[in-house]
A protein has these predicted regions:
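Nuclease and nuclease-like effector domains acting on nucleic acids or nucleotide cofactors
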Residues: 1-89, 94-137
Length: 137
């Protein structure tokens, strides 16, 4: 895994050997079958790759294919390391789609990569549940 800044975006780019494990952690097959997680952009978006190698970004919550946009993945060498954020991911305790405040403050916590995967999977399951039951999400 390599992480760092490129312009205004903080990126986490996973090594090829990590892709299957990370994809499973985020339970991407449930929401985006056939795609693999290859990175994170700005802590809020997953960078995914399709079977032909094209990359896209999609919000981590909700992980909806309608919200995917094409993305050109920069090379690892372009990333400017920043030890303040190494191994941490900014997480909204109540995701914005559920009415959480997007500004820094009491709604923001810093979590590990493993915790982030668990939180993304849990909140996406909650989103699907509400959507199926006609709730507002």
């Amino acid at each position: 895994m390599k992480e760092g800044w490129i312009g205004d975006d903080y990126l986490v780019l996973f090594d090829e050997a990590e892709v299957a494990q990370v994809t499973a952690r985020y339970q991407v097959a449930t929401q985006l079958p056939g795609l693999n997680v290859i990175g994170l952009r700005g802590w809020d978006d997953l960078i995914v790759r399709d079977a032909v190698g094209s990359a896209h970004v999609v919000p981590s919550v909700p992980m909806d294919p309608q919200n995917m946009t094409p993305y050109v993945v920069p090379g690892h060498a372009a990333l400017k390391q920043d030890s303040r954020f190494a191994g941490k991911i900014k997480w909204y305790l109540q995701p914005v789609v559920f009415g959480g405040d997007p500004n820094a403050g009491p709604n923001v916590a810093w979590v590990t990569h493993e915790q982030h995967g668990e939180l993304v999977a849990w909140w996406n399951a909650k989103y699907r549940e509400l959507k199926v039951n006609g709730g507002a999400a």
